[in-house]
Design a protein with these regions (language model features):
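Bacterial N-terminal signal peptides
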Residues: 8-17
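N-terminal targeting leaders of membrane proteins
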Residues: 22-175, 181, 189, 260-375, ...
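Alpha-helical transmembrane segments that form the membrane-embedded catalytic/substrate-binding core
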Residues: 180-181, 213-242
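Outer-membrane beta-barrel translocator domains and adjoining extracellular loop/strand segments
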Residues: 215-216, 382-387, 421-427, 466-475, ...
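Predominantly the C-terminal beta-signal and adjacent terminal strand-loop region
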Residues: 482, 486-554
Length: 554
């Protein structure tokens, strides 16, 4: 079963290497009518909206201008003020981004299919069942082999609907299962379906597995994390894979196809299995993005020094002229952190995205979005851990606070379903708690031009309710205690400085605390502090400040 965690971990690690392909900033957003052409098929009509367009020549650098690092600005002396030029060195011509009013909605693309992903999800679950029967033939629970399901066990599950909180390890329930859900989601999404339709497929696939894939009772926690957290993760991976493909032009080469395949295998499967049917690249509408890759060493208060590898991406940062937030996850923030540890290879996976919201502004220096966010958090320090799937109300914004200095931030508050507890000291021991999880987030980034960035990220979780298996639990008699709660707070501060080009150095400190109260058990306080020194390789947008003002250099 542990291989279910190792496999996605390896995929994510490889993803770090190919993520450098994602560079949408070299395209331009044009506010006029898109180019269309006649075609004998609907597929050609949709593809004709993407046309190769040479970039305008870069404006000569003006002497005396101190802040020419900004990624995008309005073209000076241009009749069309909707054209945004990139200040990066010119690259070979790539497809022009599609104006929002001219983009063909993904769910209206030709060759959309509901049958294909239904068959694919069923087939994938069938292959997983065969794998589990071969690799784990003698895994037992409640006197039954877990992976010996048949028509009788399936009918019993369908008839009784005896849903419980299961006893699987934390990393399986909270990390491997969401990745499984992301795979089912990706099969539907890359078949032309929209976000909500694909979410339904992921939830249906999770329900099918709970009914027919195992003999143990179906679990509430798996249905929530696999179907819903998996959908959020699947959408983020789908969007990032499509950025890689978009960077390769109208016909991505083998390297771009391979990079996208590592990020989102189901997307690559449909692109390969069905020829040109699903070759259309998702109309991302040229979002403002920021990403960086970090490699270094961490020193924890509870563990020894270990190597660490991190990747973070912000997609659809507010303030980009011409970009709109009409689709779920048109803005999201994704982060994954790993370390060289066989017992705890994944430190955290953090994802939040705007499901429904609006843009707003205040004056000429402030741009933001607000609305309903979905989030999936997985935090696993050495001594304890927490994971939640939640809905929150909040805002994300950027403000120019001085010449060349920008403040970006997010403020969210909401509630979800979570799991929290200590890290077992022995394999097979299980001590974590399920319940309702109110939570909050404050994330700030102060950007000093393209030279340095100061970051602060504070998160709080309060997990209370049922689902805590205490020391009296056994595999045949789980003791589910309704009383108890946990408060977990995590604060991360960091400073990154660019040394040369896209290369930089960073220093980071993370402080995590846990306070638990369970019935007659003594209250417990734990803390974990981690210091990291990292090498940073960043994207072409440097630290990600978005420029929308047309008189910045005047």
């Amino acid at each position: 079963m542990y291989s279910k965690t190792i496999i996605p971990f390896v995929c994510y690690s490889l993803f770090f290497v190919v993520s450098a392909y994602a560079n949408p900033d070299s395209a331009v957003i044009q506010g006029g009518q898109g180019t269309t052409g006649a075609s004998n098929s609907h597929a050609a009509e949709a593809a004709s909206a993407i046309a190769l367009q040479p970039q305008p020549p870069a404006a000569p650098e003006e002497t005396g201008i101190r802040y020419n690092w900004r990624r995008d600005k309005y073209a000076e002396n241009s009749v069309d003020t909707n054209v945004i030029l990139s200040e990066h060195p010119a690259n070979p011509p790539k497809p022009a981004a599609i104006a929002p009013e001219n983009a063909v909605p993904w769910e209206h693309m030709p060759n959309k299919s509901y049958l294909i992903p239904a068959l694919e999800v069923t087939g994938a679950l069938g292959l997983l069942s065969v794998y589990d029967r071969v690799v784990y033939p003698n895994q037992m629970q409640d006197g039954k082999k877990v992976y010996s399901s048949n028509f009788t066990s399936t009918w019993d599950h369908m008839r009784k609907q005896n849903w419980v909180f299961d006893q699987d390890p934390f990393n399986i329930n909270q990390f491997a299962h969401p990745y499984q859900g992301a795979t089912m989601y990706g099969l539907a999404r890359s078949s032309g379906l929209g976000f909500w339709e694909s979410l339904a497929y992921s939830n249906a696939g999770s329900f099918l597995w709970k009914m027919a894939g195992e003999t143990d009772p179906p679990s509430i926690n798996d249905q929530i994390t696999t179907g819903n957290a998996g959908s959020l993760l699947g959408e983020a991976l789908f969007r990032m894979a499509e950025l890689v493909l978009n960077d390769g032009g109208s016909k991505p080469d083998a390297w771009h196809e391979a990079g996208a395949a590592i990020i989102s295998p189901p997307t690559a499967f449909n692109r390969t299995a069905f020829g040109d049917r699903y070759k259309t690249i998702y109309p991302s509408l040229n979002p403002a993005t920021f990403w960086d890759f970090q490699l270094g060493s961490i020193l924890s208060s509870s563990t020894q020094t270990a190597a660490t590898m991190n990747f973070a991406m912000s997609y659809g940062l507010p303030g980009k002229p011409g970009y709109t937030y009409t689709r779920p996850m048109d803005y999201f923030d994704f982060e994954i952190s790993t370390q060289a540890s066989s017992s705890n290879p994944v430190n955290n996976v953090l994802l939040r995205g705007l499901l429904y919201g609006k843009e707003y502004h205040a004056g000429n220096d402030y741009r933001g979005i607000w609305g309903l966010y979905g989030s999936y958090d997985y935090l696993s320090p050495a001594a304890f851990r927490v994971s939640t799937t939640a809905l929150s109300l909040g805002t994300t914004a950027q403000c120019w606070v001085g010449p060349g200095i920008a403040l970006q931030g997010s403020l969210l508050g909401g509630v979800g379903f979570g799991a929290a507890g200590t890290t077992p000291v022995a394999e097979g021991e299980r001590d974590y708690h399920y319940g309702v999880a109110p939570q909050g987030l404050l994330a700030l980034r102060l950007l000093f031009g393209n030279r340095a960035a100061l970051e602060l990220d504070a998160r709080g979780y309060y997990v209370t309710g049922s689902g805590q298996f205490n020391s009296l639990s056994t595999s045949s008699n789980p003791v589910d205690s309704a009383g108890g709660s946990e408060t977990i707070i995590r604060i991360k501060s960091g400073f990154n400085v660019r040394v040369y080009g896209r290369h930089g150095l960073g220093l980071q400190y993370v402080e995590s605390t846990r306070d638990s109260q369970y019935g007659t058990q003594p209250n417990r306080h734990q803390r974990d502090g981690t210091v990291s020194i990292v090498y940073t390789f960043g994207g072409s947008s440097h630290f990600g400040a978005v420029e929308w003002r047309d008189n910045v250099n005047q």
